């Protein structure tokens, strides 16, 4: 009976450790995905701003020609 209790305890303990490791890996994966998504959003904002520069330059040059 003592052997069965020890075996059951060992199985439960190892299962708990395995579950904890899986949850930690899942959390790390989600954090990496969130960081990558944030980077993509920042790059798209930068591209949008860089795309507006030629428009702003042409508007300024048109205004300077008028004045």
From Swiss-Prot:
Q: Which residues carry this modification: Leucine amide?
A: 66
Q: Which domain of life is it from?
A: Eukaryota
- InterPro entries from the UniProt entry: Frog_antimicrobial_propeptide
Q: Which residues form the propeptide?
A: 23-48
Which intervals carry biased composition (Acidic residues)? 31-40
Report the subcellular localization.
Secreted; Target cell membrane
* This protein's UniProt keywords: Amidation, Amphibian defense peptide, Antibiotic, Antimicrobial, Cleavage on pair of basic residues, Immunity, Innate immunity, Membrane, Secreted, Signal, Target cell membrane, Target membrane
Task: Please name the GO terms of the biological process aspect recorded for this protein, alphabetically.
Answer: defense response to bacterium; innate immune response
Q: Name one Pfam family in it.
A: FSAP_sig_propep
- Physiological role: Antibacterial peptide with moderate activity against the Gram-positive bacteria (S.aureus ATCC 25923, MIC=25 uM), but not against all other bacteria (both Gram-positive and Gram-negative) tested. Does not show activity against fungi, and against Leishmania species. It adopts an alpha-helical structure with very low amphipathicity in membrane environments.
Miscellaneous comment in the UniProt entry for this protein: The primary structure of this peptide is identical to that of Medusin-PH from Phyllomedusa hypochondrialis (AC L0P402).
Q: Give the family this protein belongs to, as stated in its UniProt record.
A: Belongs to the frog skin active peptide (FSAP) family. Medusin subfamily.
Protein name, as recorded: Medusin-S1
Task: Give the originating organism.
Answer: Phyllomedusa sauvagei
